[in-house]
From Swiss-Prot:
A GO molecular-function annotation: zinc ion binding
Name used for this protein in its record: Zn(2)-C6 fungal-type transcription factor mpsB
GO annotation, biological process: DNA-templated transcription
Key words, A-Z: DNA-binding, Metal-binding, Nucleus, Transcription, Transcription regulation, Zinc
PANTHER family: UNCHARACTERIZED TRANSCRIPTIONAL REGULATORY PROTEIN (PTHR31001), ZN(II)2CYS6 TRANSCRIPTION FACTOR (EUROFUNG) (PTHR31001:SF74)
A Pfam family annotated for this UniProt entry: Fungal_trans
DNA-binding region per UniProt: 25-46
Gene designation per UniProt: mpsB
Purpose of the protein: Transcription factor; part of the gene cluster that mediates the biosynthesis of macrophasetins, 3-decalinoyltetramic acids (DTAs) which feature a tetramate (pyrrolidine-2,4-dione) unit connected to a decalin fragment and that have potent bioactivities.
Disordered: annotated span: 625-645
Gene Ontology CC annotations of this record: nucleus
InterPro entries in UniProt: Sec_Metabolite_Reg, Transcription_factor_dom_fun, Zn2-C6_fun-type_DNA-bd_sf, Zn2Cys6_DnaBD
Subcellular location: Nucleus
Length: 740
């Protein structure tokens, strides 16, 4: 991409050469179309970039005069469209004129490439990959226009605007810290009884505390600190302040106050400032003892309260990743005999956590992950309790069995799943071509990995989990959501292609099924995080990362629903019972999600956007000719509705037998059996070596969407009743604290 300056330069102005010639640095005869474009078969895309400062000189052949630029955003939008048109013309052959199905060898040839999205909003340039929910929404013209002025959206809610104004980003990244001393830091420490309670709150609330801090060792060092505070390493003091700051955060979440107290907020910020001062005073870039642990807890302090995605937190993770690699966390400690067994095991725990943080935050901001697993060989930590070993151990004990539900068991299970998820994101963000066979291999690997999760961490119905801790239930939900998010990203590229090519029906079914299940989790989490719910004590764990998963799900379902409405408008919609049921499930899921997003629209910018997206999509669905939900479950409310939804979810064949999903490597009998159950075509019927290249990423037929949406008037959302008559909606107004 080239940035065109408005100042005069010595070379010829860019507007006298076509876009193709400019990009390829070729000669141009300035005709319309130019001979270069004609020779390359790009006559229809031969375009001249307009210049506001200079008049366009006419060539021998007349060409249309360019319209004046209406602003930098219009020019960028125009340039993006021209570049995408050029890419499509170069990389893809025209579709065959006949209606015959394409052969398996060219299945991917007509799939559009995905560049992602570059936006300039609020004087900020931002890029997200094609997998990000913002890129998906960009394909719907009326939604793109609706959110084009991000300033208006940011100021739509005074409460949200106020919250945004208060947050200035992680102070560690911006410096400007006043000089401080050890004495002033120690003077800010609360009294011993208060500190004891906050430390206890941290270890009893942070269920993954063991992956960062070894509890018994910390308590022993904690006692030593009170005997001689002035002799304690400054970085350990920073670790202590991070622990009491997180304990303060957990304590405040349990008070359930509706309006935040400035005094409580200032106390938490004061503790956070002390963490930063200790990091700076201890020169954290030298990565001395306790530096990685303190940085990881500092990230938690910035991440947990965030209602929306914060790119600063992703930058923080980048710092942690590079510092960890600087001291060799990515290489297994067994290569270095000087590292003691206790230190080696804690390094493995730290690295497993860091790898997950990297993939989690990178996906959230729509960028490739930073850790390259090809240069890493750190093995997973052993399934041990903190009480099983200490810093004096000579040989580590063997791992506990998978039946022992430890936090490290969950860490390892999620790490295995995230490894496959990382392979999927690498595939979809790569610029190298791939094949549909590779996609299906990853699909099988993903299902096999989920099937290998220990039984204690497999998803269970809530009615079967009422005697278990909330953290165990949440861990199962998190693992299942990661699985379905991976399915969405892996198969999303083929979502719309399946509407015209039955060869991709398995991908469409997988993608829609996964998105619906993610929204079912959103509904369960919203209900059970209310006071008195099974998960109320863990509602602080519903972070912006989960909201990103919910946003991804609603955009996928919205696009598929819009495709059904488009076919219905042309009388081309196939009304099979399964398709009708799937569409009703989509509408039902989007309606419930819409009401959940409304609860936090005043405190979250992303929630406000999600609610607006669903307003538009559901309004169009209500006015279309497609059938609306009609199910006995819609007449239920409260616990009955949750129970019915859960029963429908848990009894689905795909959930009970995920590892037997259609796979080209499986036997024909198994593939046919499962695919028949799912009513989808088996990929084994058409999975041959695909020689045609497919550009990476996931995208949709934007031209099709644009032509459909731009010809319609956006309804007045403020005066329209978007609720379907057969659906039940919560009326108690709970959830205003934005726990989801």
């Amino acid at each position: 991409m080239y940035i065109v300056s408005s100042k005069k330069v010595s070379r010829a102005p860019l507007h006298v050469a076509s876009l193709c010639v400019t990009l390829h640095r070729l000669k141009c005869d300035r005709n319309q179309p130019c001979s270069t474009c004609s020779h390359r078969g790009l006559s229809f895309s031969c375009t001249y970039v307009a210049s506001a400062a200079n008049s366009v000189r006419k060539a021998d052949q007349s060409r249309p005069s360019p319209r004046p630029a209406a602003g930098i955003q219009d020019r960028i939008t125009q340039l993006e469209g021209l570049v995408l048109t050029l890419m499509h013309s170069v990389n893809h052959k025209p579709a065959p004129s006949t209606g015959a199905p394409e052969s398996a060898s060219v299945l991917d040839a007509d799939l559009p490439a995905s560049f992602g999205r570059i936006s300039l909003e609020n004087d900020e340039t931002r890029y997200v990959s094609g997998d990000h929910w913002i890129s998906i929404l960009d394909g719907i013209a009326e939604l793109k226009d609706h959110f084009e002025d991000d300033n208006l959206n940011a100021g739509a809610s005074p409460a949200a605007g106020a919250a945004t104004a208060e947050y200035q980003g992680p102070k560690l990244l911006f410096g400007c810290h006043s000089p401080t001393t050890r004495e002033s830091i120690l003077a800010s420490l609360p009294q011993r009884p208060v500190t004891d309670r906050l430390v206890s709150k941290y270890f009893n609330s942070m269920d993954m505390a063991s992956s960062i801090i070894h509890g018994p060792t910390f308590i022993r060092e904690y006692e030593t600190f009170w005997l001689a505070p002035s002799e304690t390493p400054i970085m350990w003091i920073g670790l202590l302040f991070a622990v009491i700051a997180l304990g303060t955060h957990f304590q405040q979440r349990e008070t359930h106050f509706i309006h935040p107290s400035p005094q409580r907020h200032s106390v938490l910020e004061a503790y956070k400032d002390k963490v930063i001062e200790c990091l700076v005073l201890g020169k954290y870039t030298k990565v001395g003892p306790y530096a990685i642990e303190t940085l990881m807890l500092y990230f938690s302090l910035e991440h947990l309260p965030a209602a929306d995605t914060r790119v600063d937190n992703w930058i923080l993770v980048g710092i942690i990743v590079r510092l960890a690699m600087r001291v060799g966390y990515h290489r297994d400690p067994s290569h270095t005999p000087q590292i003691k067994p206790f230190q080696a095991e804690m390094r493995r725990r730290h690295w497993a956590t860091i790898v997950q943080l990297d993939l989690m935050t990178s996906t959230q901001v729509g960028l490739p992950r930073m850790v390259n697993e090809a240069v890493c060989d750190t093995v997973e930590p052993r399934n041990l309790l903190d009480q099983d070993f200490d810093d004096q151990v000579v040989d580590l004990p063997p791992s506990r069995p998978d039946s022992d539900m430890t936090s490290i068991l969950y860490l390892n299970a999620r790490n295995k799943l995230m490894t496959v998820f990382g392979m999927i994101t690498d595939l979809t963000t790569s610029t190298f071509p791939t094949s549909y066979r590779h996609v299906m291999r990853l699909d099988r690997t993903l299902h096999n990995t989920v099937a290998a999760i220990p039984s204690g961490l497999q998803l269970k119905a809530l009615s079967q989990s009422i005697t278990e801790p909330s953290e165990t239930i949440l861990r199962r939900i998190y693992l299942d959501m990661t699985f379905h998010k991976a399915r969405c990203i892996l198969h999303r590229k083929y979502l719309t292609a399946a509407q015209v090519n039955a060869s991709y029906i398995y991908s469409r079914t997988s993608c829609i099924d996964a998105a619906v299940r993610i929204l079912q989790h959103q509904d369960v989490l919203f209900r059970e995080c209310q006071p008195g719910g099974l998960l109320h004590s863990g509602n602080w764990k519903i972070t912006s990362v989960l909201n990103h998963d919910f946003l991804l799900a609603i955009t996928i379902l919205s696009l598929d629903l819009n495709g059904a409405m488009e076919l219905a408008s042309k009388s081309q919609l196939i009304e099979t019972p399964m398709e009708q049921q799937r569409r009703e499930n989509i509408i039902r899921s989007l309606n419930r999600s819409y009401n959940i997003w409304l609860q936090s629209a005043n405190t979250s910018r992303e929630a406000r956007k999600a609610a607006e997206v669903l307003r538009i999509v559901l309004a169009k669905a209500q006015n279309s000719s497609i059938s609306t939900p009609s199910h006995d479950q819609d007449d239920l409310d409260g616990e009955a509705a949750t129970e019915a939804t859960e029963s429908e979810y848990m009894n689905s064949p795909l959930t009970l037998q995920p590892f037997l999903a259609c796979d080209p490597g499986a036997s024909t009998a198994i593939g046919t059996n499962i695919c028949t159950t799912l009513d989808v075509a088996s990929p084994s019927d058409y999975m041959e070596d695909l020689n045609d290249n497919v550009t990476s990423g996931v995208d949709f037929d934007w031209d099709n969407w644009d032509s459909h949406f731009r010809g319609q008037n956006t309804p007045n959302m403020s005066t329209m009743d978007l609720r379907f008559p057969n659906l039940d909606y919560p009326t108690d107004g709970r959830g205003s604290d934005g726990c989801i």
